[in-house]
C-alpha cells in the first residue's frame, strides 16, 4: 500500500498487462481482474473471429447483465425480509 492508501499491482487480462490501483485489498483486485479475464476468454472461445475490442465490449455487457440481475434479486430478497420483519410481532 502506498502513502495515498491505495494498493497498486500489475494484472494480466486477456494477454495484456495492466497496472491497477485501488483502496480494495490486493486479493480483491486480483479476483476482479481474474473475473474479467475469465469472461473475456469465455467470449473469445465462443467466437474466434472477434477482435479484442468486441470481446471487451461483449464481456462488459455480460458482466453488466449479471450485475443487474443480481441487484434485482438482492432488492427482491431485501423486500421479502423487510415485509417479514414488519409482519413479525414484537415481543
Put a short name on every predicted segment.
Residues 1-31, 75-91:
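Extended beta-strand/beta-hairpin segments
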Amino acid at each position: 500500500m502506498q502513502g495515498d492508501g491505495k494498493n497498486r499491482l500489475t494484472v494480466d487480462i486477456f494477454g495484456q498487462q495492466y497496472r491497477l490501483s485501488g483502496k480494495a485489498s490486493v486479493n480483491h483486485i486480483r479476483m476482479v481482474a481474474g473475473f474479467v479475464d475469465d469472461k473475456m476468454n469465455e467470449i473469445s472461445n465462443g467466437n474466434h473471429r472477434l477482435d479484442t475490442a468486441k470481446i471487451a465490449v461483449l464481456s462488459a455487457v455480460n458482466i453488466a447483465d449479471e450485475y443487474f440481475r443480481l441487484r434485482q434479486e438482492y432488492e427482491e430478497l431485501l423486500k421479502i425480509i423487510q415485509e417479514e420483519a414488519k409482519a413479525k410481532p414484537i415481543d
